[in-house]
Amino acid sequence: MIDGQTTEPKQKTRIILAPMQGLVDDVMRDLLTRIGGYDECVSEFVRITHTVHSRATWLKYVPEIANGNKTFSGTPCTVQLLGSDADNMAANALEAVRFGADKIDLNFGCPAPTVNRHKGGAILLKEPELIFHIVKTLRERLPAHIPLTAKMRLGYEDKSPALECACAIAEGGACGLTVHARTKAEGYEPPAHWEWIRKIRDSVDIPVTANGDVFSLQDYIGIKTISGCNSVMLGRGAVIRPDLARQIKQYENGGPVKDTDFAEVSKWIRQFFELCLTKEANNKYPIARLKQWLGMMKKTFDPAQTLFDRVRTVKDADEVRRILNAFEHEINV
């Protein structure tokens, strides 16, 4: 990619920020959608077990509900549920809607062993009939105007159930499906099998969103071309390269495509830390989240490694703020 390059206008693609548990919480959603390029984001999953969650619980995980289901930059946010009890998932979905949620997504893709042991996420890909029952139950009980979508992987151990599970989701009544192009067993090991997204897209009559291994504009062009999808979900790539969605929109709009520099990134880092402090005015949460993010970005931005080294052993938020301010000044001199 060349800074300043201009392209012809492309067919519009929806760019969605992925739900990533423990990584893209409401603060990260807020920041990344402020940077721009996103048409929608999806919340971290809200785990559904044997209880019906209170309003306080919904707002803890998806505070966007109280803001008209939008991040503070105005990007729509969808509520994601994870579970296997169709009746209780439906009851919770109805409560979320009662409190203001206007779109529900179902998680059939989480690869976390703890989640899978409790019959949630990707383990359900072993049971297409149960997936169908869950989707059908929620679709029948939710108000007709509330969109119901789902996210899945290609399977648990292998890809053999991929088409059956996708069809179960579509036939159950979902109006959209996101496919992460790996099995649970593959975790996040490359490569993502983008060609399988096309197979699924060709097998169902609902819109399919492509997801997996999009870390650059070139990756985006590749997944869109191979999958044939007009909707792409960004996951880890969105965190590692915070301006990725913005670059994609520049490309799609036919304008100049320009990489960010670390002077701009340093401003986002400081802003992120301040947003974390606003959420929890203590030392633990803001510092842990900052170190997590820097630890991911240092693979792409060399100065992130330098900044990570400076804050790695710091445990006081005021000291971290001082380091961030000094580093930003240093970068911008």
From Swiss-Prot:
Record-linked SUPFAM superfamilies: FMN-linked oxidoreductases (SSF51395)
Active site feature: C110
Top enzyme category: oxidoreductase
InterPro entries cross-referenced by the UniProt entry: Aldolase_TIM, DUS-like_FMN-bd, DUS_fam, DusC, DusC_C, tRNA_hU_synthase_CS
E.C. number: 1.3.1.-
Residues at which FMN binds: P19, M20, Q21, Q80, K151, N211, G212, D213, G235, R236
Site location (Interacts with tRNA): R47, N107, Y188, R289, K291, R312
Keywords: Flavoprotein, FMN, NADP, Oxidoreductase, RNA-binding, tRNA processing, tRNA-binding
One Pfam entry name: Dus
Keyword NADP: yes
GO MF annotation terms: flavin adenine dinucleotide binding; FMN binding; tRNA binding; tRNA-dihydrouridine16 synthase activity
Domain of life: Bacteria
tRNA processing keyword on record: yes
Catalytic activity: 5,6-dihydrouridine(16) in tRNA + NADP(+) = uridine(16) in tRNA + NADPH + H(+); 5,6-dihydrouridine(16) in tRNA + NAD(+) = uridine(16) in tRNA + NADH + H(+)
Requisite cofactors: FMN
Family: Belongs to the Dus family. DusC subfamily.
Role noted for this protein: Catalyzes the synthesis of 5,6-dihydrouridine (D), a modified base found in the D-loop of most tRNAs, via the reduction of the C5-C6 double bond in target uridines. Specifically modifies U16 in tRNAs.
PANTHER family linked to this entry: TRNA-DIHYDROURIDINE SYNTHASE, TRNA-DIHYDROURIDINE(16) SYNTHASE
Protein name in the entry: tRNA-dihydrouridine(16) synthase
Species: Neisseria meningitidis serogroup A / serotype 4A (strain DSM 15465 / Z2491)
